[in-house]
Amino acid sequence: MSFRGIVQDLRDGFGSLSRRSFDFRLSSLHKGKAQGSSFREYSSSRDLLSPVIVQTSRWANLPPELLFDVIKRLEESESNWPARKHVVACASVCRSWRAMCQEIVLGPEICGKLTFPVSLKQPGPRDAMIQCFIKRDKSKLTFHLFLCLSPALLVENGKFLLSAKRTRRTTRTEYIISMDADNISRSSNSYLGKLRSNFLGTKFLVYDTQPPPNTSSSALITDRTSRSRFHSRRVSPKVPSGSYNIAQITYELNVLGTRGPRRMHCIMNSIPISSLEPGGSVPNQPEKLVPAPYSLDDSFRSNISFSKSSFDHRSLDFSSSRFSEMGISCDDNEEEASFRPLILKNKQPRWHEQLQCWCLNFRGRVTVASVKNFQLVAARQPQPQGTGAAAAPTSAPAHPEQDKVILQFGKVGKDMFTMDYRYPLSAFQAFAICLSSFDTKLACE
């Protein structure tokens, strides 16, 4: 049988599995109505359907050599969306197919492609940028992130990646980030994290449902407002209860724009500065986007075990402290002290005499001048020489990776913005940073 015939039979098999699952749901539904509470013993019909599909599917017992060849060719041929959905479908057939797909399909850092949902929290490619665009809906206070499928700037089609919804509180603003385009809430299973600002819109904290790699049990950085949710009896066991600070974004005060364009700094608590060095990498990349559901009792035990100091961590303070005071404390343990986070700063634009405006080279990806436009590069950090209080810091040597633009964001039309990112940022981190540019800044404009 030719490869084209195998792929055609494979796609037909997906259709038969869908029809079989639909028939099974109907039969289970009628059976549940007849037997009363017997149907309610299962959380969903999917729990019953999965083992049936694995046992009856003719694709489950495919020889590993043939399966490897089929998925390898399919992964190479279906390199772009929407055709890449067939690669995702292969990972949904059974466990053996899923394991083979995980072995063949590489992360975006290596292959430069976004395939599975976990790719949204994995670093982007090192040698190129992943081009995306953000659509803003002012009436609904929502933002949607799409993967560019065409080099054209003003296009309506794209692969949906993430969404966010703005909620204004009395003293702060929150942006809920989700994988669902419509149901954007913290109570949904698609909730990934959030962005929170202070009253002036000058300081932001990015929260993730998964802890950063340098977080220990004695120094967890959690959301202070989540304490009441931890002790509530209405906590859903399917909703990730952790809320960990992975990044801090600061805009320097610039009343009436007297100091020129906006100036911002980003402290990436989950990314070490060593990731930009030769041979460096981002540690502890997630293998699963959302942790597996656990029991309600386990969720209470894991949350109550957090130390009291985790809720009172000073990095959550939105007082008028300086930017340098928002870094990692020297009182932390040796492991955390050795973890020096990556700091990003915006690339300073140049003044154009003829146009009478500040300009940045976006290489054609931004066409409309806006105060929201920015480019982020790695900040050169001083390195201490020797040990002890008398050690004098020395300037770190310039490295080509530190001069590359890691994230750029800009306006191309009404409620349309481009977002391009690369290693070591992930799509989730880049989207959260760009959301901070949308927020109103009373003391920066």
UniProtKB/Swiss-Prot annotation:
GO cellular component labels: cytosol; nucleus; plasma membrane; plastid
Primary subcellular site in the record, as a coarse category: nucleus
UniProt feature coiled coil, ranges: none
InterPro entries: F-box-like_dom_sf, F-box_dom, Tubby-like_C, Tubby_C, Tubby_C_CS
Protein name per its UniProtKB record: Tubby-like F-box protein 10
Domain of life: Eukaryota
Annotated GO biological process: protein ubiquitination; regulation of DNA-templated transcription; response to fungus
Subunit structure: Part of a SCF (ASK-cullin-F-box) protein ligase complex. Interacts with SKP1A/ASK1.
Entry comment, domain topic: The F-box is necessary for the interaction with ASK proteins.
Native species: Arabidopsis thaliana (Mouse-ear cress)
Record region (Disordered): 382-401
Compartments it resides in: Nucleus
Composition bias type Low complexity, residue spans: 382-398
Gene: TULP10
Entries under Gene3D superfamilies matching the protein: 1.20.1280.50, Tubby Protein, Chain A (3.20.90.10)
Tissue expression summary: Ubiquitous.
Pfam families listed in its UniProt record: F-box-like, Tub
Keyword Nucleus included in the entry's annotation: yes
Pathway(s) where this gene product acts: Protein modification; protein ubiquitination
Record keywords: Nucleus, Ubl conjugation pathway
